[in-house]
Amino acid sequence: MNKPTKLFSTLALAAGMTAAAAGGAGTIHAQQPETTVSIDDLYSYPIDSYLVSAEALNVRTKPSASSQKADTLHLGDSLKLISFSNADWAKVKYKNGKTGFVSTHYIVKAATTVKTKTKTKVYTSADGKSIKTLPADTSVSFLGWSKTNKGGFDFDWVFVDYGGTTGYMKTKDLHMTK
């Protein structure tokens, strides 16, 4: 598969999985509390690798669409996540170590492999039924965080892929290290 086709396929797969993870929840901008969550404050997760999923994405100086535009990123550009600011904005590091804010609606998590700590269940959703049980030390692809009904992130649950089956696992059941 050539590089552009592979990149497009990867982005399409990631975008589909992100949409599935959202479960149809609409974004509620006005109801989001003003919270910043640093990745390092949570755990040492392998979650800092993201890709731009839009043709062009503005980098802002503050987490607001009305703040000054600092730069523009393009489809497939990689980002390192520094922190989330609400569910709608992420502080990122991008080309040559620059930092800024981007809308989380136009980035997708780059898949990362993690392992189960113990015998672990995979669920249809964070509050759904169990669809599979995996043994300890099983590798799964970490695709992103579960989302709340209000559009925020639920850091207690992750969206994963195991052998073509996607579902949710409890964060505490996975070895999440950089």
UniProtKB/Swiss-Prot annotation:
Protein keywords: Cell wall, Secreted, Signal
UniProt xrefs under InterPro entries: Cell_Wall_Dynamics_Protein, SH3-like_bac-type, SH3-like_dom_sf
Residues spanning the signal sequence: 1-30
Signal found in the keyword field: yes
Compartments where located: Secreted, Cell wall
Superkingdom per UniProt: Bacteria
Organism of derivation: Bacillus subtilis (strain 168)
Regulation: Increases in stationary phase in a strain lacking the WprA protease.
Residue ranges of domain SH3b in the record: 47-111, 116-178
Gene name of the record: ywsB
Cellular-component GO terms for this entry: extracellular region
Gene3D superfamilies tied to this protein: SH3 Domains
Source organism phylogeny: Bacteria, Bacillati, Bacillota, Bacilli, Bacillales
Protein name (database record): Cell wall-binding protein YwsB
Major place of residence: secreted
